Amino acid sequence: MFVLASASKARQKLLDQIALRHKVIVSDFDETQLQEPDPILKVKLLAKAKADSALKKLIEENHALNTYQALLGCDSLFEFKGEIFEKPIDKEQLISRWQRMSGQSGFLHTGHCLISLDNSKSDRESISQNNSCDGVVSTRIEFMNLSNFEINKYASTSEPYNCAGGFAIEGNGGLFIKKIDGCFSNVIGLSLPWLKNNLEKFGLSRLLLDR
């Protein structure tokens, strides 16, 4: 069994897509604690903090670690001209950002922290230090030129407010993306190629396609 340290429905759907049976344990980590201006370092640190927090919760709640093989923490943000765009706080901010993003491009960064729990004891620190790997996957996204009508119409839906950058490529936001360079699933919330490669490094590829 695999543990996903995220409440993101989009990430859960990606794991369902590859038939990776999983349990969701949401991290208690307060993201506002981390004030890091570098977007790539920030998502990397946040992914690790979320994974460590979920691992701590797993142990404190007396879950039998031998029933789980791996745990994944993720965090995503959108970088636009050196500025970090996380989830928009309101409609006004979303519209302002989309007016700037229209016809331009930026980068969706997702930090990943994978912890192997195979044959692990209940020592959280040693597990995290000795059986983990982390990395950041970045995808360049180019947007179409949008009218104010299109921007306002999208801002009137609930979709963009739960997404880094204020768009969901797998939803209505996909209408406004001209092209991407890089990993598609990374834009949704986690890079499936990154996950596959690193599960293989831990000898855990058996977890994939477990229908």
Swiss-Prot record:
EC identifiers of the protein: 3.6.1.9
Enzyme kind, highest EC tier: hydrolase
SUPFAM superfamilies: ITPase-like
Classification via PANTHER family: BIFUNCTIONAL DTTP/UTP PYROPHOSPHATASE/METHYLTRANSFERASE PROTEIN-RELATED, BIFUNCTIONAL DTTP_UTP PYROPHOSPHATASE_METHYLTRANSFERASE PROTEIN-RELATED
Cofactors (names): a divalent metal cation
Species of origin: Prochlorococcus marinus (strain NATL2A)
Active site, UniProt feature: 75 (proton acceptor)
BP GO terms, sorted: nucleotide metabolic process
GO MF assignments: nucleoside triphosphate diphosphatase activity
One Pfam family hit: Maf
Reactions accelerated catalytically: a ribonucleoside 5'-triphosphate + H2O = a ribonucleoside 5'-phosphate + diphosphate + H(+); a 2'-deoxyribonucleoside 5'-triphosphate + H2O = a 2'-deoxyribonucleoside 5'-phosphate + diphosphate + H(+)
Function comment: Nucleoside triphosphate pyrophosphatase. May have a dual role in cell division arrest and in preventing the incorporation of modified nucleotides into cellular nucleic acids.
Recorded family membership: Belongs to the Maf family.
The keyword Cytoplasm is annotated on this UniProt entry: yes
Subcellular localization, as worded in the UniProt entry: Cytoplasm
Coiled coil (residue ranges): none
Gene3D superfamilies: 3.90.950.10
Lineage of producing organism: Bacteria, Bacillati, Cyanobacteriota, Cyanophyceae, Synechococcales
InterPro entries found in the cross-reference section: ITPase-like_fam, Maf-like
Superkingdom in the source lineage: Bacteria
Signal peptide range: none
Protein name: Nucleoside triphosphate pyrophosphatase
Keyword list, A-Z: Cytoplasm, Hydrolase, Nucleotide metabolism
